[in-house]
Design a protein with these regions (language model features):
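Active-site neighborhoods and metal-handling regions in enzymes and metal-associated proteins
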Residues: 1-253
Length: 253
């Protein structure tokens, strides 16, 4: 290939998005997030993320959160199909999957759908599920937005904290996009939302205190939208399951 498609992110602070500081010493019990990609000879970019247990074994708490993210990662391509509107049919469905998992571990109270509609998932995943991929690793970011009428969504978006970015994105056959759900525990963001009284009755802030030093987990692969649905790009995915990731780290010790 032609080298990396962007500066690699290798960090034990996965809760800090796009963290390029990778000079820390690995510590047992921490999670190591690796977000990297390569550029092909034809100048097309890839983008992948895996999160590894530094010790070689996930703790039960880490495993629980990882499995929630993995389920969202595996389910998302089912919604990535020709004609789908990204925000409503892809991004929000992934948020709902994450919310259901967070509800199961006690971090969200009430109906998971209410957490999505209230914008509470912003606290756990403050970024989009996907971005376009092409000759730029974030390709064609404003696709369709010049002619899109945001007026109907604006008031609701402001009230809920829901991002309208990429809301005009309609998927087509041949679209290449990332699939990167994540769950992050960002102390400053938790404190801010709590102090402002946001998401009361939805987020279990008392339980959330147990995760302040957790870090973050993201899983990312690249997807091609086809005539009949979508598929992951590549003959074989990088190690993905809890068992596979533990085996990778174990082989290095």
């Amino acid at each position: 290939g032609l080298g990396v498609s962007f500066p690699s992110i290798v960090s034990q602070h996965g809760e800090t998005l796009h963290n390029l500081n990778s000079d820390g010493v690995l510590e047992n019990g921490r999670l190591l997030l690796v977000d990297a990609g390569a550029e092909s000879l034809e100048n097309y970019c890839s983008d992948h993320t895996r999160t590894y247990p530094v010790s070689g074994k996930f703790t039960q708490k880490q495993k629980d959160i990882y499995e929630i993210v993995l389920r969202a990662h595996d389910e998302a391509p089912k919604n990535m199909k020709t004609g789908a509107m990204y925000m409503e049919e892809v991004h929000k469905k992934a948020l709902l999957s994450l919310a259901e998992g967070l509800h199961d571990v006690g971090l969200i109270k009430g109906a998971p759908q209410d957490a999505v509609e209230a914008g509470a998932m912003y606290l756990f995943m403050p970024h989009g599920l996907s971005h376009g991929l092409g000759m730029d690793v974030h390709d064609c970011e404003a696709m369709g937005e010049r002619s899109y009428d945001f007026s109907e969504m604006k008031e609701r978006a402001i009230a809920s904290g829901t991002c309208v970015y990429r809301a005009a994105w309609r998927l087509h056959e041949g679209t290449v996009m990332s699939n990167e759900p994540g769950i992050y525990f960002i102390p400053a963001l938790i404190d801010k939302c709590r102090a402002e009284g946001l998401y009361k009755g939805i987020v279990n802030y008392a339980k959330l205190d147990e995760y302040r030093d957790f870090g973050g987990i993201r899983i990312e692969d690249d997807v091609l939208v086809t005539e009949t649905g979508s598929r992951f790009i590549g003959d074989k995915l990088l190690p993905l399951t809890v068992e596979e990731l533990e085996a990778v780290v174990g082989s290095l010790k």
